[in-house]
Amino acid sequence: MARVTVSVLKDKKKRKEKISMLTAYDYSLAGMVDEAGIDMILVGDSLGNVVLGYDNTLAVTMDDMIHHSKTVVRASKNAMVVGDMPFLSYHISKKEAVRNAGRFIQEAGCSAVKLEGGSERVDTVKAILDAQIPVMGHIGLTPQSVHQFGGFKVQGKDLETAKKLVEDARALDQAGVYCIVLECVPSELARRVTEEISVPTIGIGAGPYCDGQVLVINDMLGMFRGFTPKFVRKFANLEPLIMEALKNYKAEVEAGTFPAEEHCFTIKEEVLDRLY
């Protein structure tokens, strides 16, 4: 089976088939996500929160993203791997944006990049597309703008911001993005956007009417001890299982019951006798 492509995703929207996406940041989990048949793996700058321990995503660098993206690409065979462009990697100039987007493709082996912002990012999006690099848009709550928004808040609840969201979606669609993430917006507004634009929408906290869904894998597996957003469903609760395993390991090491005989290698007695 070949990797999922832009055309595959667009065909899914036409057939009204839902698109699945999850984040992943390491070889082990990325391999499992791929084997499960998830359409896209986003190497998200959310690794700043769930992997690197920052309060937000703003401290994540291009080198951080390339390092983790390489790992995810090596682990996956079928999913489209999308590299998330971090803060300031596409804000300074179009030239720098293209160079950084190119690193995700050339160095890491990703199939596409994602960047945040609406109408104000159209020229940047077009420049990256001119370099033959597929671009995923991201509007609504854009975490790299957390200080501008005054925190992590639902977007598009009043007429002015709802109109802005629709305009941004139209602008990105016309610019040529292959899909758009809608984050933390009212469900009915997300439905309007999804019905209006030609490319798939991927929701995170945007209700059931989007063409697809994405979650942070650490959240949906119940592995992250930090804040869990309202829109997250824990499909597993692994933290207590992991904690139990860690405590059992400690107890068995201290009691001398691990490693047991079945975990050990042997050597012939005559070899030992000839050591000294």
From Swiss-Prot:
The keyword Magnesium applies. Pfam families: Pantoate_transf (PF02548). Keywords: Cytoplasm, Magnesium, Metal-binding, Pantothenate biosynthesis, Transferase. It comes from the Bacteria. Pathway: Cofactor biosynthesis; (R)-pantothenate biosynthesis; (R)-pantoate from 3-methyl-2-oxobutanoate: step 1/2. Catalyzes the reversible reaction in which hydroxymethyl group from 5,10-methylenetetrahydrofolate is transferred onto alpha-ketoisovalerate to form ketopantoate. Homodecamer; pentamer of dimers. One of its GO terms (cellular component) is cytoplasm. This is 3-methyl-2-oxobutanoate hydroxymethyltransferase. It is an enzyme of class 2 (transferase). InterPro entries: Pantoate_hydroxy_MeTrfase (IPR003700), Pyrv/PenolPyrv_kinase-like_dom (IPR015813), Pyrv_kinase-like_dom_sf (IPR040442). Belongs to the PanB family. Disulfide bonds: none annotated. Its cofactor is Mg(2+). 3-methyl-2-oxobutanoate binds at residues 45-46, 84, 114. It comes from Syntrophomonas wolfei subsp. wolfei (strain DSM 2245B / Goettingen).
